């Protein structure tokens, strides 16, 4: 193979790699920026397309959840010292992972269980994916807050809270219209279903705490019996 042919092969490989990179960037822009922004700007129409045209993707929703977990962990280490109110020694990555997915899962099943009583049209997968997309503004708000926290002065600290607060507000805003569109409800019925969802979440949390306490007491009882037997007979 001549030097000219070698050069052509290298250029061909580089071209293919570059095309793959461009394709990946195009997908990232479309799935993680353009469409979520479209939903945020036009929530009714956006979530209607999300449901009817199957534009919402589960892997994108899960990615937003993972990104939020990553940002929560990064906040322990890299938030500016003026803003930071957390103790890095108390960081538990496993707890952060479980917390986000547990919250989204509980809200999903609580909402689904309530809306089945009110003729809701949303499926579990659709509700879960919708909640994941609703994390879009919070993710970018946390990223912006994390970056700006290292440049803010004491007098500007409130700006950090404003950024995070705006992200939470937009998340709730998207979630409200998401529930309306996913279940094809009117305003009153949607508000009623959200109140029912909150009640269902409290019930699930109560049962979860009760179950955890019961398991803890049972394990303690079994351990006590084992200790008594081992001291007497072993």
Regions found by a protein language model. Give the residues of each.
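Hydrophobic alpha-helical segments
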Residues: 56, 79, 86, 137-140, ...
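Phosphate-binding glycine-rich loops and adjacent basic patches that engage nucleotide phosphates
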Residues: 3-12, 60-61, 69-77, 88-93, ...
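Alpha-helical membrane-anchoring segments
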Residues: 14-18, 56-68, 127-134, 188-196
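A short linear-motif detector with a strong N-terminal bias
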Residues: 17-19, 95, 170
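Hydrophobic alpha-helical transmembrane segments and adjacent short intramembrane/lumenal linkers
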Residues: 108-209, 213
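Selected alpha-helical membrane-embedding segments in polytopic membrane proteins
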Residues: 21, 26-125
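Short, non-transmembrane cytosolic segments of multipass membrane proteins
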Residues: 2-30
């Amino acid at each position: 193979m001549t030097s000219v042919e070698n050069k052509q092969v290298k250029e061909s490989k580089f071209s293919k790699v570059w095309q793959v990179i461009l394709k990946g960037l195009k997908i990232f822009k479309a799935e993680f920026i353009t469409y979520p922004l479209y939903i945020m700007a036009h929530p009714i129409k956006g979530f209607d397309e999300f449901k009817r045209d199957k534009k919402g993707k589960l892997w994108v929703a899960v990615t937003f959840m993972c990104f939020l977990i990553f940002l929560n962990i990064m906040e322990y280490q890299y938030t500016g010292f003026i803003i930071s109110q957390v103790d890095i020694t108390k960081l538990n990555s496993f707890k952060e992972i479980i917390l986000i997915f547990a919250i989204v899962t509980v809200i999903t099943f609580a909402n689904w269980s309530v809306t089945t009583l009110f003729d809701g049209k949303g499926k579990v997968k659709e509700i879960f994916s919708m909640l994941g997309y609703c994390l879009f503004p919070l993710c970018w708000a946390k990223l912006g807050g994390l970056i700006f926290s290292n440049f803010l002065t004491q007098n500007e600290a409130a700006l950090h809270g404003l950024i995070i607060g705006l992200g939470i507000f937009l998340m709730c805003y998207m979630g409200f219209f998401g529930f309306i569109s996913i279940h094809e409800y009117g305003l009153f019925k949607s508000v009623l279903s959200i109140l029912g969802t909150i009640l269902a979440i409290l019930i699930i949390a109560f049962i979860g705490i009760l179950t955890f306490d019961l398991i803890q007491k049972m394990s303690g009882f079994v351990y006590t019996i084992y200790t008594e037997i081992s001291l007497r007979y072993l």
